[in-house]
Amino acid sequence: MRYLLSEKAKQDIEKIWLYTYENWSLEQADRYYNLILDEIEFIAENFESGKSVDYIKKGYRASIVKSHIIFCKKSRNNIVEIIRILHQKMDMENRIDE
C-alpha cells in the first residue's frame, strides 16, 4: 500500500534526524531515521496494527517507535497519510494540528 508524508511529518522527521545527529552521532541519526521509515512502511501495509487514537482525532491511528509516535490516517482513496511524528513527551492533542 502507498503512503504519503504530510509537510509537517516531513519537517518532524528532519528535526528528529538533526537533533539525533547533534546530540549523538551521524550513525545514530541515520539508524533512527531508518527505524522510523521502516515503521512507516509497516504501517502502510498494516494500517490496522496501529492503535486507534480517536480521542485525539477521529480516524487517526498511532504507532510507537522508541521515543516517538507516528500519527496516521487512511485517505478516501486508500492511501495511508502520515500526519505527524511527535516525541512522546509532547502535548499530542495540541501539536497534532499545528
Description of each model-found segment:
Residues 1-33:
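Arg/Lys-rich, positively charged N-terminal/basic patches that mediate binding to nucleic acids
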Residues 29, 51-53, 94:
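Short, hydrophobic secondary-structure boundary micro-motifs
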Residues 68, 73-98:
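Enriched for short, Lys/Arg-rich terminal
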Residues 48-79:
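Basic/aromatic recognition patch in beta-strand/loop cores that engages polyanionic ligands
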Residues 44-45:
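Short proline/glycine- and basic residue-enriched helix-capping loop/turn segments at helix->loop/beta transitions
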